[in-house]
C-alpha cells in the first residue's frame, strides 16, 4: 500500500526486531481483497483489522473469518496486514489511514462504486483501538508527513481518509 516510501516515526525501529518479532524487518503492509464478483450488487466496502494488541495479528480467528462472512452478505472486504511491534501506534495507524486512501484511490479500477455505497472499517481489540485512533488523530486531510517529516506525500495521500462508518469491536 505504501510503494517505495513508507513513513516511520518509531525511534531506532531496526533495533527493535529480534528473533521473537512477529514480522521481519522487511515486512511491508498490504491488503488482502475479498471482492463481490458483480460490483453492481455490492452493498459497501469494509476494511477488516484483526486484534493482536499491536504485537501480532490475530487473522485466523478474526479477520479471515469475518471477511468471507461479509463477502457472503454482499460486501467487499479488505483485510489489512498492518505493521505491529516494534512499530509504534502512530506507524500502525498510518497503515490504516493509507489503506482507506488506497481503496478510495483505486476503487474505480476495481469497479467499486464509493459514490453510492459506504466505505467502513471494523476492528477487533487492538485493531479496534487503531480504528479509534484513526478517527481521533488521522482523519480527513491529515497526512503522514505531519508525523514523519522525511516522508514525501504522493497522489494517494491527497485523498481524504475519512470513513463513512466505523465499527470497533471489543
Please provide the spans of the model-predicted regions.
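N-terminal cap/lid segment of alpha/beta-hydrolase-fold proteins
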Residues: 1-41, 89-90
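Solvent-exposed loop/turn segments at secondary-structure junctions
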Residues: 6-7, 52-55, 84-87, 125-129
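Extracellular/periplasmic catalytic domains that process cell-envelope and extracellular macromolecules
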Residues: 25, 39-41, 71-72, 113-115, ...
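Short beta-strand element of the alpha/beta-hydrolase
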Residues: 42-51
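Short, solvent-exposed loop/turn and secondary-structure capping segments
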Residues: 43-44, 57-60, 90, 132-135, ...
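A fold-wide structural signal in alpha/beta-hydrolase
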Residues: 45, 71-81, 165
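Catalytic nucleophile-loop/oxyanion-hole region of alpha/beta-hydrolase
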Residues: 58-65, 80-114
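Primarily recognizes the serine-hydrolase "nucleophile elbow" in alpha/beta-hydrolase
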Residues: 98-170
Amino acid at each position: 500500500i505504501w510503494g517505495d516510501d513508507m513513513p516511520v516515526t518509531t525511534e531506532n525501529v531496526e533495533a527493535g526486531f529480534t528473533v521473537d518479532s512477529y514480522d521481519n524487518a522487511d515486512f511491508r503492509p498490504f491488503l488482502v481483497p475479498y471482492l463481490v464478483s458483480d460490483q453492481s450488487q455490492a452493498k459497501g466496502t469494509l476494511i477488516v483489522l484483526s486484534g493482536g494488541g499491536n504485537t501480532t495479528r490475530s487473522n485466523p480467528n478474526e479477520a479471515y473469518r469475518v471477511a468471507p462472512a461479509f463477502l457472503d452478505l454482499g460486501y467487499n472486504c479488505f483485510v489489512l496486514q498492518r505493521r505491529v511491534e516494534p512499530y509504534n501506534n502512530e506507524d500502525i495507524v498510518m497503515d490504516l489511514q493509507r489503506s482507506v486512501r488506497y481503496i478510495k484511490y483505486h476503487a474505480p479500477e476495481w469497479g467499486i462504486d464509493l459514490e453510492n455505497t459506504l466505505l467502513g472499517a471494523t476492528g477487533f481489540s487492538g485493531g479496534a483501538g487503531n480504528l479509534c485512533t484513526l478517527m481521533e488523530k488521522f482523519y480527513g486531510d491529515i497526512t503522514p508527513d505531519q508525523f514523519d517529516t522525511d516522508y514525501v506525500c504522493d497522489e494517494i495521500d491527497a485523498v481524504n481518509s475519512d470513513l463513512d462508518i466505523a465499527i470497533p469491536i471489543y
